[in-house]
């Protein structure tokens, strides 16, 4: 039961934290494409409004994002070229593990640190501290 609870908690956390599924702001323009409801008259003065499933803003944006990800021809061509050329993959691995690459990552983190507010820094630090504690708690409870 504990494993199922941890898995359910993980799924709920991922869904809540995924901004594309939880926000409807990016799809306001997309709603003009198709009508979002059908007005059905019940009587002379009452009209029932039935929403269509395609009118749901959040799910519609999520589906469009997934479709656009798979419809980009550049990504599949790059993956195919990397699969054909293993030397290029090794060069990418060397560049990622070299000191030059790590200094760029370090510079990026310093830039993000310098441009974030105290509240953002607090939540980042709290997340970094609480994650290992949470992993430890799950592992110790799983062993019982």
Swiss-Prot record:
- Record keyword Transcription regulation present: no
Q: What induces it?
A: Expression is induced during host plant infection.
Give the comment on domains: The RxLR-dEER motif acts to carry the protein into the host cell cytoplasm through binding to cell surface phosphatidylinositol-3-phosphate.
The answer to whether keyword Membrane applies is: yes
UniProt topology in membrane: Single-pass membrane protein
The gene behind this protein is PexRD28
Subunit comment: Interacts with the C-terminal portions the ER-associated potato NAC transcription factors NTP1 and NTP2.
Function statement: Effector that is required for full virulence. Targets host NTP1 and NTP2 transcription factors and prevents their pathogen-associated molecular pattern (PAMP)-triggered re-localization from the endoplasmic reticulum into the nucleus, where they contribute to prevent disease progression by P.infestans.
Family per similarity comment: Belongs to the RxLR effector family.
List this protein's GO terms for biological process.
symbiont-mediated perturbation of host transcription
- What keywords are annotated for this sequence in UniProt? Glycoprotein, Host endoplasmic reticulum, Host membrane, Membrane, Secreted, Signal, Transmembrane, Transmembrane helix, Virulence
Q: List localization entries.
A: Secreted; Host endoplasmic reticulum membrane
Explain the consequences of disrupting this gene. Decreases virulence on both potato and Nicitiana benthamiana.
**Cellular component annotations (GO), alphabetically ordered:** extracellular region; host cell endoplasmic reticulum membrane; membrane
What's the name of the protein?
RxLR effector protein PITG_03192
């Amino acid at each position: 039961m504990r494993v199922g609870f941890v898995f359910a908690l993980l799924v709920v956390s991922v869904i809540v934290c995924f901004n594309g599924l939880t926000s409807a702001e990016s799809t306001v323009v997309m709603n003009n494409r198709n009508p979002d409801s059908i007005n059905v008259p019940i009587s002379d003065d009452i009209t029932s409004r039935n929403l269509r499933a395609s009118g749901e803003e959040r799910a519609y944006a999520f589906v469009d994002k997934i479709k656009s990800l798979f419809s980009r021809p550049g990504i599949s061509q790059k993956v195919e070229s990397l699969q054909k050329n293993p030397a290029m993959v090794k060069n990418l691995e060397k560049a990622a593990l070299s000191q030059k690459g790590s200094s760029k990552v370090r510079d990026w983190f310093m830039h993000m640190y310098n441009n974030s507010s105290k509240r953002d820094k607090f939540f980042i630090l709290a997340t970094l501290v609480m994650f290992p504690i949470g992993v430890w708690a799950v592992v110790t409870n799983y062993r019982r």
